Amino acid sequence: MNQENPPPYPGPGPTAPYPPYPPQPMGPGPMGGPYPPPQGYPYQGYPQYGWQGGPQEPPKTTVYVVEDQRRDELGPSTCLTACWTALCCCCLWDMLT
């Protein structure tokens, strides 16, 4: 392959990216153009509150979360947790010193 002589391009060749635009009529368009009239748009009023035409939301349901079991009592699991914590702290202290 040569930089100065590339292989031929298969196909009809490049074309313009877009067709030319049709001529536009002069003067303002059917609605008076893209700009508002000099006196502004007429007042439409405030929007309605409440029903806006879309689907209504279902009523909200209150959900109460209740603990299954309180763990205020001192039992074997609390003692075991404290022992494991102390053992880990002792091992960590031993490694650091």
Swiss-Prot record:
Residue stretches spanning the membrane: 74-91
Bias kind Low complexity: ranges: 41-50
GO annotations of cellular component type: extracellular exosome; plasma membrane; tertiary granule membrane
Family: Belongs to the CYSTM1 family.
Compositional bias per record (Pro residues), positions renumbered to this chain: 1-40
Subcellular location: Membrane
Keywords: Membrane, Transmembrane, Transmembrane helix
Keyword Phosphoprotein: no
Record's protein name: Cysteine-rich and transmembrane domain-containing protein 1
Signal peptide interval: none
UniProt membrane topology term: Single-pass membrane protein
InterPro entries in the cross-refs: CYSTM1-like (IPR043240)
UniProt-annotated stretches for the region Disordered: 1-61
Domain of life, per lineage: Eukaryota
